[in-house]
Amino acid sequence: MAGKTLYDKLWDMHLVKQRDDGSALIYIDRHILHEVTSPQAFEGLRLAGRKPWRIDANIATPDHNVPTTRTERKGGLAAIADEVSRLQVQTLDENCDDFGITEFKMNDVRQGIVHVVGPEQGATLPGMTVVCGDSHTSTHGAFGALAHGIGTSEVEHVLATQCLVAKKMKNMLVKVEGKLPAGVTAKDIVLAVIGRIGTAGGNGHAIEFAGSAIRDLSIEGRMTICNMSIEAGARVGLVAVDQKTIDYVKGRPFAPSAEQWEQAVACWQGLVSDADARFDTVVELDAAQIKPQVSWGTSPEMVLAVDQNVPDPARESDPIKRGSIERALKYMGLQPNQAITDIQLDRVFIGSCTNSRIEDLRAAAEVARGRKVAATIKQALVVPGSGLVKEQAEKEGLDRIFIEAGFEWREPGCSMCLAMNPDRLESGEHCASTSNRNFEGRQGAGGRTHLVSPAMAAAAAVNGRFIDVRELLA
């Protein structure tokens, strides 16, 4: 009998009941809530006369709608200009207060983006099932946890029952071997993977990322990789547990302590795929061949190395692909065969649940140090992923590096990743962004998003156009 994959093990650990229709009932260990997808779920609970089944399994924080300027944040709820956004944040506060759920409110130093806050608080632990009403919950798979996004009706179901109906996925292995070149990061790995398999490549699969290049990554780098499993078409991304995982979790507020810690570690050390485990699909990449990546189009799969040119639709024989390229070029305002390094930028955004952790800010600050944002850049934002990340960055002096270079240093939140708060693009503007999605209008109606790593974003800010960051780090 073949061994089990990590995904198989996590599934079996949480299987409550297998159903005749092929679906199953899965137990959920951790539920993370934010202001956008939770109000209707709590209202459904009240209408049914129910309460959360296991209150301590839930944590919450507002992130999508919160303003990121210091002035607005000091003003509290009243300073949120948009009425719907203000109501959503207020409703989250009221619901958590009413039901006794732990919430890191807007001006709590522990507040931040849900997928930054969960891990940094130790609320995400190896072997857990983790869900949240947000597709990028896959981020938490970096800890060897089975984590994925859910819809609002499922948020209500988890609150009421601590279980979820799900169907088991296929197993995909993405193996990245070798050593990354200097200046190439986890973000470049995952963009290269998506460029290789496409945004539908992982459909119906849980992707496990493995290989020496993945093992060499920090936990923060692994979170970046798992975060963008969604853009590769998968619902789940995973990295096996190792000593780095255990060291990261140890001592965090929600982590086990004393005797329970030793028991937990003994359990976690088995959260790896067996040597003889079988995967339905295997994809292999050579880390040494990966260069800094830049997305050029309106899908994450439309991505190239920084030294390449955007495609010419006339050279594409497939009419569907040709049409897709033509539409993307038109929306993005680019010409066939235009060099990536000739794309003029208007704004730069360093932040989001993909790249707003302390390691990301350090990488960007290394590039920004002693340089100035180009005069042609209208705005360059740095938005830490949480109040604690911001606090640590300020302790290290990173805020001063950014401010002296001409960046804006903001309060934590989702910010310009999505047009649900005051930070957004104007129509026609090009933005170098460390976020995860670049479809039409994602950062604002008519906005044009280019996905890059934090180091590449900082390099673009000081250059005014894309440049291979390795030229600045040499």
Curated annotation (Swiss-Prot):
GO molecular function, one term: 3-isopropylmalate dehydratase activity
InterPro entries named among the record's database cross-references: 3-IsopropMal_deHydase_lsu, Acnase/IPM_dHydase_lsu_aba_1/3, Acoase/IPM_deHydtase_lsu_aba, Aconitase_4Fe-4S_BS, Aconitase_4Fe-4S_dom, IPM_dehydratase_rel_enz, IPMI_cat
Cofactor: [4Fe-4S] cluster
Gene3D superfamilies: Aconitase, domain 3 (3.30.499.10)
Binding-site residues for [4Fe-4S] cluster, renumbered to this chain: C353, C414, C417
Enzyme class: lyase
Protein keywords: 4Fe-4S, Amino-acid biosynthesis, Branched-chain amino acid biosynthesis, Iron, Iron-sulfur, Leucine biosynthesis, Lyase, Metal-binding
Pathway assigned in UniProt: Amino-acid biosynthesis; L-leucine biosynthesis; L-leucine from 3-methyl-2-oxobutanoate: step 2/4
Catalytic activity: (2R,3S)-3-isopropylmalate = (2S)-2-isopropylmalate
Comment on bound cofactor: Binds 1 [4Fe-4S] cluster per subunit.
GO terms (BP aspect): L-leucine biosynthetic process
Source taxon at top rank: Bacteria
Cited function: Catalyzes the isomerization between 2-isopropylmalate and 3-isopropylmalate, via the formation of 2-isopropylmaleate.
Self-association and partners: Heterodimer of LeuC and LeuD.
Family listed: Belongs to the aconitase/IPM isomerase family. LeuC type 1 subfamily.
Protein name: 3-isopropylmalate dehydratase large subunit
UniProt organism field: Pseudomonas paraeruginosa (strain DSM 24068 / PA7) (Pseudomonas aeruginosa (strain PA7))
Gene name of the record: leuC
